[in-house]
Amino acid sequence: RGTGFYSPRAVGTLTIPSTAGKVISVGAYDSRQNAYADFSGRGSQFLPIRKPDLAAPGVSITAPVPGGSYATVTGTSFAAPFVSGSAALLMEWGIVKGNDPFLYGEKVKAYLRKGAQRVGGYEEYPNVEVGWGRLCLAESIPYGIS
């Protein structure tokens, strides 16, 4: 009949490796509604670190499919590449262009968290659904530096 949880809970549905402290954990949100995607995993309220770190678009994403066409897809698997690409652009800005030549993983995560913007309906940040907020690369790069 399919897979299901014996006793489902709304929180604590993130799995390894997203629960590790040094990784950048990504949740999904609906960019058209500026709202959390309810299928996205949630962190635990009881751990000393809040996960996910941030959320990226993961609902109704246009993506290439085999055969040379496109389809509308949904899932955190489509949110994570937004963050990966943003991390790569930050590293280009920092290391290649010399704005932060000693940029490393934890600093990339800190820049992305700093630039995250609020998602509607939340008072507390970080939280177990969208972390520090939704991805915004433009706000992640320090002002005055191009």
What kind of region is each of these model predictions?
Residues 2, 119, 129-131:
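Intrinsically disordered, low-complexity segments enriched in small/polar residues
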Residues 3-88, 139:
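Extracellular S/T/G-rich loop segment that most often corresponds to the catalytic His/Ser-adjacent loop
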Residues 12, 43, 98, 131-133, ...:
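Glycine-centered flexibility motif
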Residues 19, 110, 114, 139-142:
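Charged/polar, solvent-exposed surface patches and flexible loops
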Residues 41, 91-93, 145:
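Hydrophobic alpha-helical segments
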Residues 58-125, 134:
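Hydrolase catalytic cores
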Residues 123-146:
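C-terminal domain-closing interface element
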